[in-house]
Amino acid sequence: MDVAEYAAHDATGLAELIREGQVSACEV
């Protein structure tokens, strides 16, 4: 995950991406 992707999501959105397996917690 790059900075632009990170900035495009709030905490809830990031948690959803992790839950769906699109990114790992380490990436975030």
UniProtKB/Swiss-Prot annotation:
It catalyses: an anilide + H2O = aniline + a carboxylate + H(+). It is an enzyme of class 3 (hydrolase). One of its GO terms (molecular function) is aryl-acylamidase activity. Its EC number is 3.5.1.13. It comes from the Bacteria. Keywords: Hydrolase. The keyword Cell cycle does not apply. The keyword Hydrolase applies. Also acts on 4-substituted anilides. Homodimer. This is Aryl acylamidase. It comes from Nocardia globerula.
